[in-house]
């Protein structure tokens, strides 16, 4: 998949189509909350495997049962279709 920067209209659609994500400072981000650290870490492990598949890696934070994921495409300096795809895949993992 060749990444391209999403335009304003596409970004507005993104936050509607992919629930929970918001646009902040040229990136999209979402906070995920779990019952405990083990659930949070299991989620991060599953996300890591998808990230490897797309060769696209998030900035993320984990504090106990909370995971914050931030996505953008550093090489292009903004939010791309690849970030959109990865956010959608991450939501699927969370919804399992």
Swiss-Prot record:
Pfam families: Pterin_4a
Organism domain of life: Bacteria
Enzyme class name: lyase
Reaction catalysed by this enzyme: (4aS,6R)-4a-hydroxy-L-erythro-5,6,7,8-tetrahydrobiopterin = (6R)-L-erythro-6,7-dihydrobiopterin + H2O
Xref: SUPFAM superfamilies: PCD-like
Example of a GO biological process term: tetrahydrobiopterin biosynthetic process
Coiled coil, from the record: none
GO molecular function: 4-alpha-hydroxytetrahydrobiopterin dehydratase activity
Keyword list, A-Z: Lyase
EC annotation from Swiss-Prot or TrEMBL: 4.2.1.96
InterPro entries listed in its UniProt record: PCD_sf, Pterin_deHydtase
This protein's record includes keyword Lyase: yes
Entry keyword annotation includes Lipid biosynthesis: no
NCBIfam families for the chain: PRK00823.1-2, PRK00823.1-3
HAMAP family the UniProt entry points to: Pterin_4_alpha (MF_00434)
Family statement drawn from the similarity comment of this UniProt entry: Belongs to the pterin-4-alpha-carbinolamine dehydratase family.
Name of the protein: Putative pterin-4-alpha-carbinolamine dehydratase
Natural source organism: Prochlorococcus marinus (strain MIT 9215)
């Amino acid at each position: 998949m060749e990444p391209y920067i999403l335009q304003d209209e596409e970004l507005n659609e993104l936050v509607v189509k992919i629930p929970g994500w918001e646009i902040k400072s040229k990136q999209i981000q979402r906070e995920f909350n779990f019952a405990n650290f083990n659930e949070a870490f299991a989620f991060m492990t599953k996300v890591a495997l998808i990230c490897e598949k797309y060769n696209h890696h998030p900035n993320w934070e984990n504090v106990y049962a909370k995971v914050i994921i931030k996505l953008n495409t550093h090489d292009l300096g903004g939010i791309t279709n690849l970030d959109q795809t990865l956010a959608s895949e991450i939501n699927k993992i969370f919804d399992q």
